[in-house]
C-alpha cells in the first residue's frame, strides 16, 4: 500500500516463542481469523488500525472491529531429532594417534619432579595444535539446522500424503465408474428384455379390413366314398332292429303318441269325481 502521509506507528505486537497472533473479527465470528507472528498498531488521524508486519501478506484492519489473541502454534513434531546431531565426534584412527602420550614416572627427588611436570606440559601443548578438535556449534546454528531438517521432513510427509490421497481418489473414482457402468448395463439389458417381451406379446394385425365385411367360413367339401355310405346304412339298420325289439318286448307299456293324446283329451272331458265316487268305482273294478 502507498500512503500520501505515512501513518504513525503506535506500537508493535509480537508473539512469544511457540505462539502466534490471531486477529479475529469481533462482530462476525464466522469470518476466518488472520494468523500472523507480529502486527503494528497504526494510527491515521483519530482512528487506529492493525497492520501486518509481514509485507508479503498485507492487511489493514480497523482496531474497533477486530481483537487480537495469542494462540499456540499448532506444530506437530513428526520426527524427534536431537539438537546435538550436527556435532561431529572425531573417532578415527588419526585422532587416536594424535592423543597425548602417557607421562613418564615421577622420581622422588624434587628436581626430577619439576622436570617431569615440564615434560608433561610440553607434550600436552604439542598435542593440542595437532589434534585441533572441532568446536561445538552455537545454539543459533543448531536451531537453523533443526528447522531445516524439520522443514525437509514436513515436505516429504506432505508429498507422501498428497500421493496417497491422489491414489485413493483415483481408486474410488475408478470404483464409482465401474459401478455406474455395471448399473447402466443391467438397466439396458432389463429394458431390452422388457421390450422384447412386449414386442412378442403384441397381437398380430388382422388379415381383412372392417370395410370388407365379416369373413365367411369356407366349407370344406369332403369326398363321399362308398365305404362311408355302407357304414351309415349298417348303422341305421342296426338301430331300427333295436327299436323293433324293444317295442315287441314292451307291448303293454308302450303307448304311441296319438293314443296318449286321445287319453289326455278323454280325461279332460270327464268331470271331476269326488273321493267317494272314486272309491266306489275302484271297488267295482276290483270285483270285476
From Swiss-Prot:
Acidic residues bias: start-end ranges: 180-194
Biased composition (Low complexity): 126-136
Regions of compositional bias (Basic residues) in chain numbering: 153-162
Basic and acidic residues: compositionally biased ranges: 143-152, 278-288
Transmembrane segments: none
InterPro entries: GrgA_tf
Superkingdom, natural source: Bacteria
Stretches the record annotates as Disordered: 126-227, 258-288
Family: Belongs to the chlamydial CPn_0623/CT_504/TC_0791 family.
Protein name (Swiss-Prot/TrEMBL): Uncharacterized protein CT_504
Amino acid at each position: 500500500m502507498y500512503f500520501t502521509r505515512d501513518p504513525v506507528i503506535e506500537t508493535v505486537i509480537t508473539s512469544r516463542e511457540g505462539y502466534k497472533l490471531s486477529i479475529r473479527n469481533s462482530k462476525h465470528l464466522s469470518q476466518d481469523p488472520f494468523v500472523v507472528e507480529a502486527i503494528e498498531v497504526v494510527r491515521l488521524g483519530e482512528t487506529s488500525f492493525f497492520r501486518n508486519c509481514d509485507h508479503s501478506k498485507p492487511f489493514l484492519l480497523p482496531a474497533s472491529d477486530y481483537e487480537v489473541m495469542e494462540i499456540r502454534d499448532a506444530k506437530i513434531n513428526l520426527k524427534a531429532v536431537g539438537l546435538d546431531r550436527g556435532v561431529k565426534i572425531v573417532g578415527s584412527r588419526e585422532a587416536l594417534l594424535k592423543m597425548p602420550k602417557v607421562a613418564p614416572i615421577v622420581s622422588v627427588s624434587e628436581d626430577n619432579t619439576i622436570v617431569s611436570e615440564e615434560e608433561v606440559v610440553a607434550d600436552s601443548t604439542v598435542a593440542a595444535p595437532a589434534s585441533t578438535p572441532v568446536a561445538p556449534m552455537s545454539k543459533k546454528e543448531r536451531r537453523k539446522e533443526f528447522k531445516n531438517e524439520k522443514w525437509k521432513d514436513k515436505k516429504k510427509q506432505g508429498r507422501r500424503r498428497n500421493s496417497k490421497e491422489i491414489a485413493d481418489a483415483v481408486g474410488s473414482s475408478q470404483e464409482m465408474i465401474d459401478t455406474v457402468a455395471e448399473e447402466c448395463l443391467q438397466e439396458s439389458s432389463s429394458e431390452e428384455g422388457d421390450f422384447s417381451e412386449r414386442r412378442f406379446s403384441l397381437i398380430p394385425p388382422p388379415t381383412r379390413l372392417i370395410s370388407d365385411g365379416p369373413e365367411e367360413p369356407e366349407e370344406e367339401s369332403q369326398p363321399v366314398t362308398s365305404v362311408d355310405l355302407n357304414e351309415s346304412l349298417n348303422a341305421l339298420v342296426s338301430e331300427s332292429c333295436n327299436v323293433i325289439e324293444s317295442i315287441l318286448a314292451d307291448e303293454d307299456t308302450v303307448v304311441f303318441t296319438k293314443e296318449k293324446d286321445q287319453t289326455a283329451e278323454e280325461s279332460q272331458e270327464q268331470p271331476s269325481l269326488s273321493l267317494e265316487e272314486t272309491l266306489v268305482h275302484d271297488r267295482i273294478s276290483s270285483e270285476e
